[in-house]
Amino acid sequence: MTVPSITGGVIDLMMEIPTGKAGMGMKQARALTKDAGTDKFSHHPAQYLFKDAGDRMSLAQNPDALVQMMDAHGVAAALVAVNPRKPEGALAMFEKYPTRFIGEVGVDPNAGMKSVRELEATIKLHPNIVAASAAPCLLNPQVPIDDRKFYPLYAKCCELDIPVNMLVGVPGPRVPYRCQHPGLLDEVAYFFPELKVVMRHGGDPWTDLCVKLLLKWPNLYYSTSAWAPKHYPRNILEFANKRGKDKVMFAGYFPGISYERIFGEMGDLPIREEIWQGFLHDNAVRVFGLEDILKNT
């Protein structure tokens, strides 16, 4: 089975490439972990899971080669990180390829109002910067999703009308998981009904809870980052096929996972034909407000 043709092309909601920060969270993981094994990892804080990601790091640092790779797999645009203190690399990508790359700003609630101001200032640097992102497990110290430290950032996202991509579930890096339990999103979604939150990295092993929360809260969404398609949770796919057709979006996680593997496995997913367009394109355009960016593609 092959993936149907997608009008407008595929939108990849997570390309984890270095655009002004240490690649793939290595620096943060080393500061938090206590096991000897992580110190030996060279390219990924969960290298025991993403063993060959290092083979693709040189490609990940070459925007021209990335666009060629995207073209080969029908990817119209990809979301990359923007470091608020070193945004130049990402800004150069947006200027050279204005319809191919979009950006998200990593936030650190431990920094208080400094992070709030950095978020707003960075969003205003370029129209292609469309979201915030957070990895609670890699913050130092860790900050639970529903902690009051996050609330000023959530409020700012509401003001700016941007979604926040949030890691949920047991993380690959050898750090504690409690701060990322998806159940913590319940109160956030309740207190901030205008805030669009996109769950990242699977929510495993609480994917049944993720589905319940997605069904309950209109402002919660789910993306498939950090999982190869053959490992996508089946209950998430069942939800996408039915009541969650507007809620589930594709995120690839290159270079952690190769495009060859992602799109080689994609066609075997039990997704109904009428769901593909939303999953791979339309939902991302709507949630992240990409209409103007993509109109010239």
Segments and roles (model prediction):
Residues 1-13, 20-72, 77, 244-247, ...:
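Mid-to-C-terminal alpha-helical segments outside catalytic/metal-binding sites
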Residues 196, 203-262, 268-274:
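Active-site-adjacent C-terminal substructures of enzyme catalytic domains
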Residues 76-77, 82-172, 176-179:
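Active-site gating/metal-coordination segments in enzymes
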Residues 88-95, 115-122, 143-147, 174-191, ...:
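Distinct, well-ordered alpha-helical segments
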Residues 18-20, 85-88, 110-113, 139-140, ...:
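Active-site environment of divalent metal-dependent phosphoester hydrolases
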Residues 57-69, 111-123, 207:
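Short, acidic/polar
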Residues 11-15, 78-80, 102-105, 130-134, ...:
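Hydrophobic faces of well-ordered beta-strands that scaffold small-molecule active sites
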